[in-house]
A protein has these predicted regions:
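RNase III-family endoribonuclease catalytic core
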Residues: 1-111
């Protein structure tokens, strides 16, 4: 398979894994968020604008997809947790969402 096709395939799977993670994560941290707010947060999670803060969005999704195909769903979720969650929380707070995430400082300086 040519590298571009492999990248697209990995990204396609990674996009699905990210969507599953985002929905699960939003339900776990749900603090009375309205369904409208939850939908807006989900859209932010999977947006190219957010993903581009890490690099080219397709490459970010492909990295998630590779974690999934090589080591399974738990590994892919861990990859997202370790690499994307803190910045997502910061981005959401900058947009006016008051996310209280267990185990994370309210105004974390990490990016």
């Amino acid at each position: 398979m040519d590298p571009e096709a492999k990248l697209r395939n990995d990204a396609w799977i990674g996009d699905a894994v990210l969507a599953l993670f985002a929905r699960s994560w939003l339900l776990q941290i749900g603090q009375g968020e309205s369904s409208r707010d939850r939908n807006r947060l989900f859209e932010l999670w999977v947006s190219n604008q957010f993903l581009s803060s890490f690099g080219e969005p397709t490459s970010v999704e492909a990295a998630i997809g590779r974690a999934y195909t090589s080591a399974g769903l738990d590994a892919a979720f861990m990859f997202i947790e370790e690499n994307l969650v803190d910045r997502f929380v910061q981005t959401a707070r900058k947009r006016g969402f008051n996310l209280a995430v267990p185990g994370r400082a309210k105004n974390s300086a990490r990016s």
